[in-house]
Amino acid sequence: MSKLAIFVGKKSILRKIRAHKSIGKEEARAVSKIMKTGNLSAFYGTWGEGFYGRKYVKRFEKSCNKYFKVKYAIAVNSWTSGLICAVGALDINPGDEIILPTWTMSACATSILAWNAIPVFADVNYEDYNINPKDVEKKITKKTKAIMAVDIFGHSAPIKELKKIAKKY
C-alpha cells in the first residue's frame, strides 16, 4: 500500500496553486469606510429599524439590481446564508438531487441538505480543481434538479459546459 505524501509518500501534485487577487482598492475603501463607523450590523435578534440593512446595504442591493439587470437582490451575512437562499429559490423539494464538486466548502452540501435535498458529488478536474462536466453528466438521474457551479482558487467553473449539460437534460 502506498504512503500518503504527508507521511513521506510520493507527492501527486507537484505545482503550486495559483493565487488570485479578488479585492481591489475600491472595495477596500468601501469596507474601510463602513468599518470606521464601528457598527457592522443593524440586526439585534429581532425586528427593528435596519432589520434588512441600512443605507450601505440598501445601496449595495440597488447597485446589484442595476448591474445584473434583475428586480431583486438580497445581501446576506455570509456565503452559507447566500447558498441557502439560492437553493431555496430553485423550488427544490425533499429528495431532489443537486450535483456539486467534491472539492468545495461544506456549506455547499449543507445548503442542499437545509432543503432536505440530496447532494451528489462529481469529480473535479486536475488542472483547476473545478467540477468535471463529464463526471457531472454521469451523475445525472431523474431526481437531478440542479448543478452547483463552484469557482475554486479564483478559477471560474466551466459554466458553458455545465449550461449545455443542463439544457440537454
Where are these regions (language model features)?
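Conserved PLP-binding active-site segment in aminotransferase class I/II-type PLP enzymes
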Residues: 1-80, 84-88, 114, 167
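PLP-dependent aminotransferase-like
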Residues: 88-169
